């Protein structure tokens, strides 16, 4: 099972996308992206909110985590994620593993 979400601008232009998948460690959020011309318009936050609603409906008690690029860490921290462990490299890009805090 994999979930895929796409955000579109008012004119129907693709603005962003994301997916999630269950793993042995919980539910991993992956491939979050917002096109540069649509950034800083709250699209990423709205997309993340919809993805989390979908994940919680299917896996209400599962831990939710992701690997965030360094530049995205502040965004995910504002959304309730916290860093876990040390910084690491994936595909030549520095990341932190982040886990959604339980509320």
Give the residues covered by each predicted segment.
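Conserved beta-strand segments that form the floor/walls of ligand-binding pockets within enzyme
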Residues: 28, 33, 65-67, 97
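Conserved acetyl-CoA-binding loop-helix of GNAT-fold acetyltransferases
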Residues: 34, 40-54
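Conserved acetyl-CoA-binding loop of GNAT-fold acetyltransferases
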Residues: 77-86
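A conserved beta-turn-beta hairpin within the catalytic core of GNAT-like acetyltransferases
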Residues: 22-30, 39, 58-60, 92-94
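Conserved GNAT acetyl-CoA-binding A-motif
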Residues: 55-69
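Hydrophobic beta-strand residues of extracellular immunoglobulin-like
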Residues: 1-7, 66
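Conserved beta-strand in the GNAT
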Residues: 6, 12-21, 28-33
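C-terminal "cap" of GNAT-fold acetyltransferases
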Residues: 67-71, 86-103
């Amino acid at each position: 099972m994999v979930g895929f979400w796409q955000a579109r601008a008012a004119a129907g232009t693709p603005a962003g996308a994301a997916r999630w998948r269950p793993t042995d460690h919980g539910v991993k959020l992956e491939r979050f992206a917002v096109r540069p011309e649509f950034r800083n318009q709250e699209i990423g936050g709205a997309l993340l909110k919809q993805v989390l609603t979908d994940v919680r409906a299917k896996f209400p008690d599962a831990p939710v985590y992701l690997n965030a690029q360094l530049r995205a860490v502040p965004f995910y921290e504002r959304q309730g994620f916290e860093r876990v462990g040390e910084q690491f490299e994936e595909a030549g890009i520095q990341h932190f593993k982040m886990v959604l805090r339980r509320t």
